[in-house]
Amino acid sequence: HDALPIYGLCGLIIENQEILKGDKREVFDGMWSSSLTDSTSKGKPDIEAVDLTTRLQDLNNILECTTKPIIFDGDTGGKIEHFVFTVRTLERHGISAIIIEDKVGLKKNSLFGTDVIQTQDTIEGFCNKIKAGKASQITDDFMIIARIESLIAGKPVSDALERAFAYVQAGADGIMIHSKNKSGEDIKEFCLAFRKQYAHVPIVVVPTTYDHIYESELCDWGVNIIIYANHMLRAAYPAMMNVAKTILENERALEVRELCMPIKEILELIPGTK
């Protein structure tokens, strides 16, 4: 799941939230450190404007609250010469994986699609970045997952597959395939074709636009990791806006009482406060 702007609180939610479906316990398996969520919560555009050191401070707050794996949204990964240090730093902090996208130049959010210029790296260039990152690791545990932007850039599934095969050969530990198509059919086509070539390489998807598809169906396509990338921030922001607007309208807080959790509950939310 995505990281909330209140990072430690998000860690607590993901660590502790669970439901029972019949006799089956459902929980979140890990956390996604989203660069969109990270930058938006700081009032910055999603263009890699928030540096690694700042993002690591937030990650440390999450790591105080959770033992679950964290996947770091690495955007483009930056210059190869800088990426090797990013890998070592994340590895040292206990982050489980980084996902980097095969784009170059100023980062623009993928969900803009072809409304903005989306420039893909060459296959050779991105393979070199993957190889350099893998060579810089101290342990074998850290994962570098290659995010393919072909479908975002308006290219066919065949281009995405060509890149995926090359990136795995270069050492990528997994493949993330992204699309803003609402049907999910292009994702399905990619996953089924990729699985014929590689039976065990993890596939990651982010069903923000094709959110009608159940996890079970995605798994049938061969998907291993499903990231709900920004939903908690998108839920929190309208709620906060509504409270602020209602207070302005009524010049008191009574009307927002039913929108807020009781003071007693917030005081007792974090162990050790009382």
Name each region found by the language model:
Residues Y7, D73, G94, G133, ...:
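Conserved, mostly hydrophobic/aromatic
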